[in-house]
Amino acid sequence: MNSRRRFVKQMGRGMAAAAAYPILSPLQSCNGRSRTATQVETTTTSELFFKISLAEWSLNRALFGGQLDHLDFPQYAKENFGIDAVEYVNQFFMDKARDKAYLGELKARCDDHDITNVLIMCDREGDLGDTVPLQRRAAVENHYKWVEAAQFLGCHAIRVNAAGEGTAEEVAQCAAESLTELATFASDYNISVIVENHGGYSSNGKWLSGVMQMVALPNCGTLPDLGNFCMKRSDPLEQTTEAYMATECLEEYDRYLGTAELLPFAKGISAKTYDFDADGNETSIDYGRILRMVNETGFTGYVGIEYEGHSLTANEGITKTKTMLERIGSGLT
């Protein structure tokens, strides 16, 4: 299947949604180095109840466009934003998962600059909720190399997607079985497998929390993305990432309800931002409300900045997001 067809298939899965998302019984079965002049000080966040990391996707345009190299991302994050923890996206080093020389160079750069590797976001490795057994097995095994890479880099987790085609019940059961298998494998590496609400069924908090209840393993959890509760989108005008990002949400799950449903299983938070008002607040997400919810659960892990707006440059958006999180978070400790 060529890349164009793969894109259409992947995007289509992210647009599917169903009218009902029941929680299934576990008994059901699935068939089928030196500082630069521009370097900023790393902000001390000890007064916050959470830690701040930077998701590599925030800089996707620079990375895809060749203005920024994946190996330079960690140092770039620290020198430009004062962020010393990073979240990788496998798309930017897709063929390097088992390249120990490459991974060793990446790890050495992080060690040299006191940067923490938090997780690897994994895409394009098949559908963990696939209802076809052989394809589902391939998807599970395709993620093994990222578990190994995550351990090598010192990450605590890999982020995966619970996608699949079929009814809500079928995809949930198959995703649960895949996650059980993958998390069992990952436990030998001290790696967690965390699922993001990432379109389709997974953007329904009740559905995804139900999958978590079915898996019920300590190293399997969620990565609530505060902006990813769209269950159905309009069709992209062309088959590019930019065109998909410009699509309109046609059906959206309540983000505050969804966040509440996913937080009990959270092993990370993805702080999605798009635009800001004159007071520096995100215009579409009430971060004061969200962070109070997060704080009430006792969460103390990483909140990863993921800027996806277009009105600001990526650097401006990242900086505004960090400032907002620190301002709101400091008032909740």
Q: Model-predicted segments: where are they?
A:
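Boundary/entry segment of secreted carbohydrate-active catalytic domains
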Residues: 45-69
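Active-site acidic/histidine proton-transfer and metal-coordination neighborhood
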Residues: 11-24, 37-47, 75, 109-224, ...
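N-terminal twin-arginine translocation
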Residues: 1-6, 18-37
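Hydrophobic faces of well-ordered beta-strands that scaffold small-molecule active sites
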Residues: 50-56, 84-88, 117-122, 158-160, ...
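Acidic/histidine-rich catalytic cores of soluble enzymes
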Residues: 85-86, 176-292
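Charged helix-capping and loop-helix junction motifs
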Residues: 68-72, 100-105, 136, 140-143, ...
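Catalytic domains of carbohydrate-active enzymes, especially glycoside hydrolases
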Residues: 69-89, 154
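Glycine-rich, proline-tolerant flexible connector loops at the mouths of alpha/beta enzymes
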Residues: 87-107, 165-166
